[in-house]
Amino acid sequence: HGYVDQVTIGGQVYTGYQPYQDPYESPVPQRIERAIPGNGPVEDLTLLDIQCNGSGGSGTKPAALIASAAAGDEIAFHWTTWPSSHVGPVITYMGKVPSNTDITSYSPTGSDVIWFKIDEAGYENGKWAATDIMSAQNSTWTVTIPKALAPGQYIVRHEIIALHQAETYPGAQFYPDCFQVQVTGPGTETPTSQALVSFPGGYTPTTPGITFNVYSGSITSYPIPGPPVWTSNEAFSGGSSSSAAASSTAVASSTADSSSSAAATQSSSAAASGSAAPSSSAIGTSTASSAAASGTAIVDANTCMNNYNKCIDAGQPDPDWSGCTATKDACLAGATYQRLARSGTLGRLSF
């Protein structure tokens, strides 16, 4: 299990939505990422939750802020601790917000065919994108906004599909995160209808790659779900994706992908009203130490969840779900929620 806890857009660092911290803050922090309920997956392809995460089928709500980026800029997504058992593809889509609509109030419906794929990576040379490749990149995945893309407001949908239980449907686990970006630049192209899908609708139980046995022992390729990658209308070939190759995603620089990186420089000017300023500090996945026997130990909720992931990972392919869950729940019962202290350091609020 996991989620994107930090994103670097055009060289600027933004803190992602923190599901175990933000809801308990007052006021609730404003983000460029749409809220997610936690680090768990979506498994039902018919629910609106498959679009940008959520629970109960209602999806998620727009975020308050917008990041600014030029067409051709890179976006680097930093993930929380990702279990090595959760093999699968890493896929990124973008969806253009309709004209005369503000992204901070726009929630696509399941019938809105707006999503086009800008990056994908699956299985190549014995390595899975979500585990082998991403872990070698400090839990970071980097994509490029197509240079040909016309200016406008876009939702960037970044996901991992975990295949460790995908022998049948339902089984595959989907982890989508959505970010709000104002794209600038001289680009003039909008993807044609052949490149667009809806969510739900972009994947079905019979889509190649949705069911897949990763334990067969004879894997040579993997059919990545969804349409082909769009970089321009001229380059787009149409049809269904059958790519099994890892993308040419570049390794993010150490200043963009590290959860312990130094504070980002404040942007000298906002791109537009409601635009997000870069994070004043890079919040790591977990800064609290592991649970200790001492009653004075401060345990961050993210540490509880990361230890839960490791417990599940260690028991694959048949983990002790009840035991790992009980340990997680006991940890969370006494956990605190990591936040920025007034001193600017991570920890409990100091007064």
Swiss-Prot record:
It comes from the Eukaryota. Its main location: membrane. Glycans are attached at residues 53, 138. Cu(2+) binds at residues 1, 86, 175. Binds 1 copper ion per subunit. O2 binds at residues 164, 173. Its cofactor is Cu(2+). Transmembrane segments: none annotated. GO terms for cellular component: plasma membrane; side of membrane. It is found in: Cell membrane. Lytic polysaccharide monooxygenase (LPMO) that depolymerizes crystalline and amorphous polysaccharides via the oxidation of scissile alpha- or beta-(1-4)-glycosidic bonds, yielding C1 or C4 oxidation products. Catalysis by LPMOs requires the reduction of the active-site copper from Cu(II) to Cu(I) by a reducing agent and H(2)O(2) or O(2) as a cosubstrate. Belongs to the polysaccharide monooxygenase AA9 family. This is AA9 family lytic polysaccharide monooxygenase A. It comes from Gloeophyllum trabeum (Brown rot fungus). The lineage of its organism: Eukaryota, Fungi, Dikarya, Basidiomycota, Agaricomycotina. The gene is LPMO9A.
